[in-house]
Amino acid sequence: VINGVINSLIIATCTAVLSIYFSAMTAYSIHVYDFKGKKFIFNFILLIMTIPTQVSALGFFSMCTDWGLRDTYIPLIVPAIAAPAVFFFMIQYMKSSLPIDIIEAARIDGSGEFRTFNTIVLPMLKPALAVQAIFSFVASWNNYFLPSLIIDTSTKKTMPIMIAQLRSADFLKFDMGQVYMFIFI
């Protein structure tokens, strides 16, 4: 049980932190810069959001097998960094509360782009970052589909897989009290 909590905590924390940072950076670049193909890239990211995970699962599984990434946490964390839903909410928040004038003032003062993003933009996005971190953490914590495909070792399994194994261990002698206590922990 403790291994499942720790494994889920590691995966969910890494996913939440990395997805909100890189999604905010992507949203910042599309919101602030004017470049050719900006609208196409924005629409492409939104289009990706409509594709369910299950559609690409077979190719993803075979790629993880070929690259030797099965039974590791990398295939559970790295693809979650490119979170189109988090990107969409971040860019919507930026459109409503991030004035371009502040960014231009930072550029005039000699601030580089990464410094501007990390020291000026991110603190202004704290409410959106907090909300999206919670959403990303919960979504990653509750993810059952990909960990059940990728993780084989019992010591690396996450909480949803352990709960499912507990529920289906013996379907004739099924103790819901034990399952609910396990979920509570």
Task: Describe the residue ranges of each PLM region.
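A structural signal for multi-pass alpha-helical bundles of membrane permease subunits
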Residues: 1-185
